[in-house]
Amino acid sequence: MKFSHTEEDRDGRHLDVLTDEEDGLRIIVSRLGAELISMARINEAGNWIGFLYRDNDVTAPAKGWANHATVMGYYLHRLKNGSSLYRGHEIKGGTHGFLRAKTWHLAGSFTNESGASLKYRITPDDFLLIEYPLKVSVDLTYRIDVTGVSVLFEFRNHEPELTAHL
């Protein structure tokens, strides 16, 4: 197997493209929200056929949902009236949390003959206390290998004196 990782800027987004060159599988991840915006296979005619809603389209739609496979958190729906209290700390935010609106750091890319991965990271330095008041980091890894595509979420508690934050 042969894998490649390339980067591109498109419509104001920084994208990472991870491709299985031999089996014709490709994922594209936007660093904005660490969002998977394309998962596609190449067909016999040499065209990429996507599996996601609005696959590989980063333009704003005329109406409707603008995302593809959103990473949501640390809360998943809405905060009533845009705010809530968590452990005595106020949280303010919109729908589906703040993670999808943040630019994540590419913490590493890895390719070899058996697979390839992209690891993204967001830390407490990347968000405001009003967005989430506790110190938690998230690593998100997308991987392609012989078994397919996988996604791994890893949470790191930077306040070990406190019990679970999520």
Regions found by a protein language model. Give the residues of each.
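Surface-exposed acidic/polar loop and edge beta-strand patches at domain peripheries
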Residues: 1-154, 158-166
